[in-house]
Regions:
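Extended, folded cores of ATP/NTP-driven motor/assembly subunits in large transport
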Residues: 1-404
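P-loop NTPase motor domains
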Residues: 53, 60-79, 90, 253, ...
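Hydrophobic anchor at the beta1->P-loop junction of P-loop NTPases
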Residues: 441
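Conserved lysine of the Walker
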Residues: 449
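Hydrophobic positions on the alpha1 helix immediately C-terminal to the Walker A/P-loop
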Residues: 452
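Post-Walker A helix-loop "phosphate-sensing" segment adjacent to the P-loop in P-loop NTPases
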Residues: 459-469
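A short helix-turn-beta junction within AAA+ P-loop NTPase domains corresponding to the substrate/partner-engaging
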Residues: 485-489, 698-711
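Conserved P-loop NTPase
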Residues: 726-777
Length: 777
């Protein structure tokens, strides 16, 4: 037998003691503050958690790259340690879900909508997979003391994290309470919310940590076990097929049940593996030689070597070739699985379903007889292995059991965006948790862009204390804003609503003198009013001087009282001696005292409502460039005010491509896009004209830097551009090609997942969100 395996079995051999209590079933002897468990006489273990990656929806080339990178990870495993890969399916706790995601009623007029939204969320949670899949790596090693183990885990952990990072997966080490929570949640289904463990408090009171995690009762039968009122069964993979598809692990763990699957891996040092393979090959060749000698003695000189002997020789040569020339390692592995159910009938039915799935892949699972306790301690991420049903594999054949499938997006206190098409889990995302929470919603007309934006607006209006600002060029949001109690500001040359272009608060300057920043804005405004020609140095100096002058009294009064207007600014220009000042005053007269003076009057609308919609449908061609600048500046005013109050602001800009048609509004928007994050604000751009949008270098940069993108059904040319810009595979592209409304891809940080968002039509909220004729309010 191979020396590595012999010494491992010797180390793992322990004297069997009959458990005197439920606590004795758990094989952990000692726990330490840094997440290390002692699980044997000199055996220590440490668990790491890693995130899923988009393997199932990757292109063939990407899959190959991921497979090879995962093989590299397996090759890097230390031959002196045992590595356990665990996939843990745990059911989403309804109480936790309600606490985290349902919207609390506040007793106001919006409660009817909150009840409707909560009912939708609960229906989706019930219909969804409602299974959260966690993935772990547990390393166990024999060391003389915990200090040696600590040093070892620090080194191995750094390598492990680096390898997972190259795969695009985030790997973190688990603390003691996090490891205990895994065990607690498995043994005490339905009591997840009650788990609380403080290691210092436990020691102080002299309590046993096992009391916090073990079930009330445990009974082990011949081929199943019972913990409390639940039933469980441990299986192991007995027979492997010659060829296994890389989707087998994903299919086995796709069951909507609490289950755990573990693969224990024992790598063999290459020199030892090569010696063993050469010895086996020599044995096969000796058998062939002996057979031929016997045939020759019988004068049977033309006899061909039996097929099975030839096959053995061929396979051993291939195996040796893998080890010596193809960078493969020899690995011993054991695959075990535990699943639980509420009744024995359900357990038997689930077992049969798992056996059928394995048979489909020409593999054979078997139930452990009289070894259920040993099997349970093998499959769970303690770091122990009590089942020795080893199978010899190469790195490549072991990598087929790839633990990756698809990323799920599940942020605490996030917003519901739909269901993951592959895992069927709910997509709950919080843009505030991203490095750059700005968003784009892209799709053809009728693809569900406005619906997606309104869904987000409704959630923010009902569940948060954030302010919401909408720029609406198509008058699509008015019914929703009215229903939510917001303010609609109609902006046009003939509208009675006015916004003062020179509105400014003390926070406008980002800590510096706000007039300096406002002066820049007035210069941009004047360039637009004069006709888009660049201002000369003289003109800029005059504008800067006049801006400082008109704001002087307002600043001296501590930003209280009447704010100056563009009319005051023009009057100040006329007081200057330079002829250039008179020219500027004449050029802007149409917009200060003429028929387009809507932005030269005092603001007479409530721009401080929690929900403000700027309706710019009637803004004519002449007023559009200046109108967009003034609206964006008004939004900047609001954002800076909210920052001082510690309040978040969400800005939704429909048909954002309109803003990129004007140089100044495009540049202003680009600056806003970069700066809003530090102000606690988040911008969203909505458009169907992706091709037009990407013609602008500014827009292209903004899109590439946005970490949150919702892509719905796309036109052919737009798909090609998006695929290039965001590195989308052909398979992923199929989710934004000729799909129904509300279906597509959602990019959250580095995750890109296919989603579907179907909202119940028999609700008031649906009527407020839909733009289909005859369905709206």
């Amino acid at each position: 037998m191979i020396k590595t395996l012999t010494s491992l079995l010797k180390q793992d051999k322990e004297k069997f003691t009959v458990p005197k209590g439920v606590q004795d079933v758990i094989p952990v002897k000692t726990i330490y503050d840094d997440g290390i468990f002692r699980v044997g006489k000199d055996k220590y273990s440490k668990t790491f958690k890693f995130t899923d990656i988009n393997y199932a929806v990757a292109s063939r080339e990407d899959k190959e790259a991921m497979f090879l990178e995962y093989s590299e990870l397996l090759n890097s495993l230390d031959s002196g340690a045992t590595t356990k890969l665990t996939i843990n399916n745990r059911r989403l706790n309804r109480l936790d879900f309600e606490k985290s995601f349902l919207i609390s009623e506040t007793g106001d007029y919006l409660d009817k909508y909150r009840r409707e939204y909560n009912k939708m969320l609960l229906d989706k949670a019930t219909g969804a997979n409602s299974i959260v899949q966690d993935k772990y790596v547990t390393i166990s090693i024999n060391k003389k003391n915990v200090e040696d183990a600590r040093t070892y885990f620090a080194r191995v952990g750094a390598d492990l994290i680096a390898h997972f990072s190259r795969l695009g997966s985030k790997c973190v080490e688990l603390e003691t309470d996090e490891r205990l929570r895994i065990i607690h949640d498995f043994f005490r289904v339905g009591e997840e919310a009650s788990f609380h463990f403080d290691i210092k408090e436990t020691r102080k009171k002299g309590h046993d940590f096992k009391d916090y995690i073990c079930p009330d009762t445990m009974e082990f039968e011949k081929d199943y076990f019972k913990m409390g009122d639940r039933f469980g069964r441990v299986l192991f993979l007995r027979e492997y097929a010659s060829y296994i598809k890389d989707s087998m692990v994903a299919e086995l763990t796709d069951m909507n049940r609490n289950l755990m699957m573990s693969i224990d891996i024992v790598p063999v040092p290459t020199d030892e593996a090569v010696r063993e393979a050469e010895s086996r090959l020599l044995g096969v060749e000796t058998n062939i030689t002996n057979w031929q000698r016997k045939q020759n003695q019988n004068n049977n000189f033309s006899a061909t070597v039996p097929y099975d002997m030839e096959q053995q020789k061929k396979e051993m040569k291939e195996f040796l070739d893998d080890l010596t020339t193809r960078d493969q390692r020899m690995m011993f592995s054991v695959l075990t699985m535990v699943h639980t159910a509420d009744s024995k009938e359900q357990l038997d039915s689930d077992t049969e379903a798992l056996l059928t799935t394995a048979r489909k892949h020409l593999c054979q699972f078997a139930v452990l007889k009289y070894q259920q306790m040993d099997g349970l301690n093998t499959v769970m991420p303690f770091g122990t292995r009590k089942i020795d049903a080893f199978r010899t594999l190469t790195t490549e054949s072991l990598a087929v059991f790839i633990p990756f499938r698809v990323q799920d997006i599940y942020h605490e206190n996030g917003i519901y965006y739909g269901q993951n098409v592959i895992s069927k889990n709910m997509i709950i995302a919080d843009r505030k948790q991203l490095l750059n929470g700005n968003e784009f919603i892209l799709g053809v007309s009728g693809g569900g862009k406005s619906f997606a934006a309104k869904n987000e607006i409704i959630n923010l209006a009902l569940a948060s204390d954030a302010d919401i600002i909408i720029i609406d060029p198509e008058r699509e949001y008015s019914p929703l804003v009215k229903a939510m109690g917001g303010e609609i500001i109609n902006i046009s040359a003939t509208s009675p609503n006015h916004i003062n272009a020179m509105d400014m608060n003390r926070e406008y300057g980002d800590g510096a003198n706000p007039v300096i920043l406002k002066s820049e804005f007035i210069m941009s405004l004047c360039e637009q009013l004069i006709g888009g020609n660049n201002l000369g140095a003289k003109q800029k100096s005059i504008i800067d001087r006049c801006t400082a002058s008109v704001y002087r009294t307002y600043q001296q009064n501590d930003y209280q009282g009447t704010v100056p207007t563009l009319q005051d600014f023009r009057d100040e220009l006329l007081k200057q001696d330079e002829p250039e000042a008179k020219e500027i005053a004449l050029a802007i007269e149409l917009f200060t005292h003429g028929s387009l003076n809507t932005f030269a009057k005092q603001t007479n609308v409530d721009t401080n409502s929690f929900l403000v919609c700027y309706d710019i449908l009637d803004l004519g061609k002449q007023l559009m460039p200046i109108g967009m600048l003034v609206v964006l500046d008004s939004i900047l005013n609001r954002i800076t005010q909210n920052r001082a109050k510690g309040r978040h602001t969400f800005i939704f800009i429909d048909e954002i491509y309109l803003l990129f048609q004007h140089e100044y509004s495009a540049n202003f928007l680009f600056t806003l896009w970069k700066r809003v994050r530090k102000y606690g604000a988040y911008a969203s751009g909505i458009t169907q004209n992706v091709d037009d949008l990407l013609q602008s270098h500014t827009a292209r940069t903004m899109l590439a830097n946005s970490e949150f993108i919702i892509m719905l059904n796309q036109a052919a040319t737009d798909r090609v551009e998006l695929a290039k810009l965001l590195n989308i595979s052909d398979l992923q592209m199929s989710y934004i090609t000729n799909v129904e409304a509300g279906h597509g891809l959602i990019k959250v940080g580095s995750s890109l997942v296919p989603f579907a968002n179907r909202f119940p039509k028999n609700t008031q909220l649906y009527k407020l969100m839909t733009t289909k004729p005859g369905e709206g309010v």
